[in-house]
Amino acid sequence: MSNPDSFFNEVTEELRRDRMVGYLRRYGWIAVLAVLLIVGGTGWNEWRKANDRANAEAFGDSVLAALENDDPADRVNALAQIETTGAQAGMIQLLSAGELMETDRAAAIAALQAASEDTALPEAYRQLAALKRVIAGGSDIPMDERESLLAGLAQPGQPLRPMALEQTALLQLEQGNPETAIEIMTDLLSQSDVTDTLRRRVTQLVVALGGDVASR
């Protein structure tokens, strides 16, 4: 290679290096920031998961400790002292209502109603509270109100639909409509999302009422 060619190559290489340095000075911080965000984001996610796990374990320990009290009133008081947010609050309300059922049924039913109407709770907890209130309240809750609550819970796609249909059938029995109750329960047995326990319970009731479950 001639000296002029060598000279031009050296100049070209220097220009490339200068240009690269300029790019790094101008845009290098973006690459560094991207790396930091990736690394930092991963670290943040891991920390958040660990923190969530620790909080869940602490919550579980607090609940178990509260339920170890011998007296139902002490258990309710201990549960009330647990700091909660979101779904945890719903769980505490349901547990407290269950404990109250042993000593103060009216207070338990009122607690379940409050939980079912608390829009700050996840929908699943509100629906469960409503169903438990219907079951626990029985005839103390007007028939039309129970029917209305169960109709909403028994809509297609609702997670508690099978149990709501079972309770709807029991309401029909309470009103002296065994044929309608059998029809509801046989339809329930044909559905795929019915648990084995519920299926056995409903089957026994249908048979006791003289219904036919041979094809179910």
Kindly give the residue locations of the regions a language model identified.
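Short extracytoplasmic
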Residues: 58-94
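Alpha-helical membrane and juxtamembrane elements of multi-pass inner-membrane transport
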Residues: 5, 14, 18-21, 60, ...
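Transmembrane signal-anchor/signal-peptide helices with a preference for the extracytoplasmic
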Residues: 15, 39-61
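Solenoid-repeat scaffolds in large eukaryotic assemblies
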Residues: 56-59, 74-79, 108-109, 146, ...
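N-terminal positive-inside, membrane-proximal cytosolic segments immediately preceding the first
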Residues: 1-36, 54-55
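Short Lys/Arg-rich amphipathic alpha-helical segments
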Residues: 31-32, 45, 137
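Soluble extracytoplasmic domains of inner/organellar membrane proteins
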Residues: 91-111, 115-216
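Onset of an N-terminal alpha helix
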Residues: 13-17, 72, 213
